[in-house]
Amino acid sequence: MQGAQTSEDNLGSQSQPGPCGYIYFYPLATYPLREVATLGTGYAGHRCLTVPLLCGITVEPGFSINVKALHRRPDPNCGLLRATSYHRDIYVFHNAHMVPPIFEGPGLEALCGETREVFGYDAYSALPRESSEPGDFFPEGLDPSAYLGAVAITEAFKERLYSGNLVAIPSLKQEVAVGQSASVRVPLYDKEVFPEGVPQLRQFYNSDLSRCMHEALYTGLAQALRVRRVGKLVELLEKQSLQDQAKVAKVAPLKEFPASTISHPDSGALMIVDSAACELAVSYAPAMLEASHETPASLNYDSWPLFADCEGPEARVAALHRYNASLAPHVSTQIFATNSVLYVSGVSKSTGQGKESLFNSFYMTHGLGTLQEGTWDPCRRPCFSGWGGPDVTGTNGPGNYAVEHLVYAASFSPNLLARYAYYLQFCQGQKSSLTPVPETGSYVAGAAASPMCSLCEGRAPAVCLNTLFFRLRDRFPPVMSTQRRDPYVISGASGSYNETDFLGNFLNFIDKEDDGQRPDDEPRYTYWQLNQNLLERLSRLGIDAEGKLEKEPHGPRDFVKMFKDVDAAVDAEVVQFMNSMAKNNITYKDLVKSCYHVMQYSCNPFAQPACPIFTQLFYRSLLTILQDISLPICMCYENDNPGLGQSPPEWLKGHYQTLCTNFRSLAIDKGVLTAKEAKVVHGEPTCDLPDLDAALQGRVYGRRLPVRMSKVLMLCPRNIKIKNRVVFTGENAALQNSFIKSTTRRENYIINGPYMKFLNTYHKTLFPDTKLSSLYLWHNFSRRRSVPVPSGASAEEYSDLALFVDGGSRAHEESNVIDVVPGNLVTYAKQRLNNAILKACGQTQFYISLIQGLVPRTQSVPARDYPHVLGTRAVESAAAYAEATSSLTATTVVCAATDCLSQVCKARPVVTLPVTINKYTGVNGNNQIFQAGNLGYFMGRGVDRNLLQAPGAGLRKQAGGSSMRKKFVFATPTLGLTVKRRTQAATTYEIENIRAGLEAIISQKQEEDCVFDVVCNLVDAMGEACASLTRDDAEYLLGRFSVLADSVLETLATIASSGIEWTAGAARDFLEGVWGGPGAAQDNFISVAEPVSTASQASAGLLLGGGGQGSGGRRKRRLATVLPGLEV
């Protein structure tokens, strides 16, 4: 982990003093309630809801998310400051019913309460006092009925808000502009700031707000820690925050263990390791969350590009609706995946004795079946009797997923459940072929409209949660109790540094400097630079970064030329790259075996998508990963200090302080979680603050108060790193069969080749008269060697096309180890480029591993299978339902697989991916424990249709499975939606592109006279302006090859004197007639011996014969050509 930073360069020291939070009051008359509803977690009958903290919609522009909160005064003349950041969400509590619900289905609150009791989690217990009256916290002159009230609270003091220990001071109100509304905010200070005490009636408390926090925030934390006494957990978190008890064991007495743990042969160690891992997560996760964070650009709601073309509030709400639809696959994956982080159920220990897996013997497991089993406390006394659930015994196989399991995933919170249901409405159903189901209309008009429905009693069948559950029931995962070591799925924002091109971090030269003798002026041609250069070359050919063409091909000649130009650009870059590696003595054949795809998961809460669901998923993901990386550390400490019959709380009393102290150096920056430690100072001994004692009495004065920091060190998390090995190097026979490349030639080599998708795209352009499909036409050609020729077309051109496609496809099949069929020219170029590199590295036996992105695509479809579009209206019959939905459409989302994830990763995507954290020790006697976050696999057939086993490509099924060599990541780009695209600092002029194109032509054709091609390119780019080019113009355009200026000008003068049209085609035909084409002149060459220095002859006796191969003599002479001329 990095050393502590100085006070000048960390966000904590730069933050300003302020309160522990604010109460915001928004005028109902002008506040965009529908936009807030689309961002929030309202349900039918809600009294409080959560909304993301965003500048321009919930807080004012320029709001600082980092603050030094004044939270205590040990004496009247000294204040304590604590650096913290704000919580990601705000809580709307006053007049919350004015915000429309995001999901209109009734009965969610009662369902959540019943399910919470069924699973054994405690409900919220209100404080023995009434909620604060509006007059206690509303500023004078404001009508409480005309304003919406919400609380923005800091991370370090949210437990104080929950327990009613903050004080609102209305006299210190501030007027702020939130969007188009003139709003007011009132500061919240901790009651410890007032040494003389504050009457309880003046302390701000709202039972609905605290209940919402209990359900939407703290229950999820309790689930991640596998404790059921949520209220007690909040008390412990508050005590830890106030009294700085991070190194004291707290939650172990609250732990509960399933039967599989109690009955384990090594149950004592397993219970201790499980409890210790939870304690470490409780100690470190709050510290990481409350640390100061960078303010991302996506926090500025009023500048979201999403609203650029919106006119009026309806268009803005519709844009938000589409944006939410693009996030739906991430949320639905967490529900439909069997290995979702929401279903992580505990810690298990393998019974195997393999030494190589010692550090991986403890691992996180998941399974809904385990979550509803009975549990025992640390003293092995039963404490939860369990819940049978529907068919949980698995009489028909695994248990059935029920609505109660969905409520569990939503942390028994009606707010989160409503938001989950809203996202699930965008999902398409996948009907099982084994269980035929009635039509949606029949269900809505029949069973859903029955008074027997426990949720809506038949009054709102179209939007009832049971109806949504019925529509998607075949996609929910099975309920099992698994003890396997499988990946778990996490969701959140991607980091800014991802290496997801085909060869990942190959030759990035980071941490690979073995010696410090490298000259500073030596060029470092990295793999990243290679890809950038390739994109630049393609842009000169009129191909943008997404593979789109400026000029579409109009016939077979253009089609072939398009690919030949791309091939030439790729081959030129490959030669230059390989020469650079050889020149710098880089052992690329060894380095390619250890390259990885690298993805980063951002640990900044404010970088996460603006949605309370993603806040919940971020908290769960961080807590789970912290526990996972702590398991081998706890295991080793327990092995050195065995429990010997002690209960986990007893063992932790004697060992936790040492374990917690060492955890920071043992677990951070060891391969998965990166963080930095910052020292927070306040530059001045005093600061200007309001006189809070006077303000409490309604008088506003300022005073200069001496202050000091109550907490100096701050642990700031950065990223979680996930890797995927590119080149297969394992010995597992089953895996080897998935990666090994068959040596038999396939009959369908063309339709599986690199040109097939392009041949299909331009099928009507190439073959306007044929009625054959492109698939059949080219499959037929591979067998019968014949292609149709349109009437009036040149048979020679079509023969050249067929030979080009055939030859290129055969060559591709022989050398290809990247199992994709390119869909655009950028992917085609990168595939050719990387195949050439891998061939040079000798990697031709196995296919490489790929990461494919599943990118959401929203679409409007007929609403027949999406009853929620009807709202709360009644449905009398199936015919009435069909008529009502016949004219309506529903927004749904599907995912499309991308061949290469690198372009998506540049757009700052939201990602959902499965991760497995492996632990290992160093080499050469290094006994430190390192971790590696490896990309895993999704479990569950209902996650997405792209994850179902593909039957194979082509007309015949491919042998061998390809799923093991392809990993998938759900990715939603945010660039252009919530983050503005970067504009170029300087505009590129046309003349710059012309110059770059000419230099590229000359560089590629140094072996031949290139004046012919340069002139044709100039005529194509500049047209008639070529006639007036001066010598200075020609020298500028030719750049470092300006010596060709005279030849180019003479050729242009010849064209001008001929009077032909200034087009590339006319110029080419004219010059071919005059010169006979490029390189047509046949000059006589003589062989000239290359002189050798006298010193060399004297010292080595080396005599080199000159070559008669023209320019070949200028190339580097390799050893094989030098040895024959050696005379001793």
From Swiss-Prot:
Major localisation: virion
Classification via Pfam families: Viral_DNA_bp
Keywords: DNA replication, DNA-binding, Host nucleus, Virion, Virion tegument
UniProt-listed SUPFAM superfamilies: Viral ssDNA binding protein (SSF118208)
Localization, UniProt: Virion tegument; Host nucleus
Physiological role: Plays several crucial roles in viral infection. Participates in the opening of the viral DNA origin to initiate replication by interacting with the origin-binding protein. May disrupt loops, hairpins and other secondary structures present on ssDNA to reduce and eliminate pausing of viral DNA polymerase at specific sites during elongation. Promotes viral DNA recombination by performing strand-transfer, characterized by the ability to transfer a DNA strand from a linear duplex to a complementary single-stranded DNA circle. Can also catalyze the renaturation of complementary single strands.
Annotated GO CC locations: host cell nucleus; viral tegument
Gene that encodes the chain: DBP
Record's protein name: Major DNA-binding protein
Subunit structure: Homooligomers. Forms double-helical filaments necessary for the formation of replication compartments within the host nucleus. Interacts with the origin-binding protein. Interacts with the helicase primase complex; this interaction stimulates primer synthesis activity of the helicase-primase complex. Interacts with the DNA polymerase. Interacts with the alkaline exonuclease; this interaction increases its nuclease processivity.
The family this protein is said to belong to: Belongs to the herpesviridae major DNA-binding protein family.
InterPro entries: DBP_sf, Viral_ssDBP_head, Viral_ssDNA-bd
Region annotation Required for nuclear localization: where it falls in the sequence: 1104-1128
